[in-house]
Amino acid sequence: MGMIDKLFCPKCGHQPASQTVFQCTDCRGILEVHVNFGQLTAADFQRMRQSRDQSIWRWFDFFPLAQRSSIVSLGEGNTPLLPATRLGEKLGIANLYVKNDTVLPTGSLKDRSNSVGLSVAREWGFKTAAVMSTGNAAASVAAYSAAAGINSVVMVPAGTAASKIIQARAYGATVVVIDGSFDYEVAKLYKAAVQEFGWYDCLSSNPYRDEGKKSYAYEMADQFDGESPDWVIHPTAGGTGIYAMWKGYKEFLSLGWIQRTPKLVAAQSEAAAPIVAAFERGVPDIEAVIARETVAESIQVGNPASLGWRALAALRESGGTAIAVSDSEILEAQALTGSLAGVFVEPAAATSVAAAKKLRDTGVIGRGDIIVCNLTGHGLKQPEAIRLTDKEFTPIAPTLDMLRQQIARFEIM
């Protein structure tokens, strides 16, 4: 089983006495969980691959949970790794794959994190879970809290897509819309509320929660039959996905279950790209920026707080990079992903495809490289991003002549 070996601060090395503390009492850094997965063998890899449980929990040994009875699962994980041949041809990439997390229970990658996070909350006996979110985490925490029998409170900034708020409400969450910026006013109130009311904190500062995102690496190792792609491109806000994925790859590498690791790429919106800025400057820490408005609202985070440095370290250790893309590039990538790969993604998810195009155009990645773009959220999370005109839906007379005129515009005859 996956037993917690230690909880420690990766910055100063301090190990707190309690496993329920999330922040280092010495340097205020975010703590990290080390799971003792024992002396696993290649036979164990095959056993896990062949498990009837195809959720992330077939990798139970790698997660910080003592008892299987504590698991809170909605069937998350083992999402399709699809060859995107037509999309690849358009981008000039011969071996392009998309990892389709739009099919996860609440439609986003956050389900990987919150299945683990809420399982820990159940094991510890918490009654209420809380999160502040630009939308996707709100819905996911609400769903997994409902499955766990735990109350949920979610705080979102004003302007969050109504579809995401409605989804969280549908799962029974108490949704509070805050007038203010996500990185500052919302964050300040959230931190005070968690301390005041003793709620279980489901933010990325929770070192248990994002252990779930290690499953990206586990699944790709399985789906590539023990091999690794050359590059994995991931839409990035605070960087926990990059960090956790790299941690998962290193765990499998240490066991000999894979022979090499991929280069990781953090894809950010130009309107909120503190990780890209720090990577390009060659500095070890993140400097917060004021996030501007962007169509990629799920990754509109200008202040990764004390977490971003781990993503930077992972990018550099993997030999990868970080890249920012514009809203126009994101919307173009969203349209291409739908029309050429058959996957409807929200704008934030499309940043991985936009980044792949930009990296190919600049020669950073080669035509023959094996590329995976993580598609992290469903397009129905933010349907208003599809900019249609009323003219496209103007009714026509029910005649073949009118139909010919209508469809001729779309070049399908």
Question: Could you say what each language-model-derived stretch is?
Answer:
Residues M1-M413:
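PLP-dependent amino-acid enzyme catalytic core
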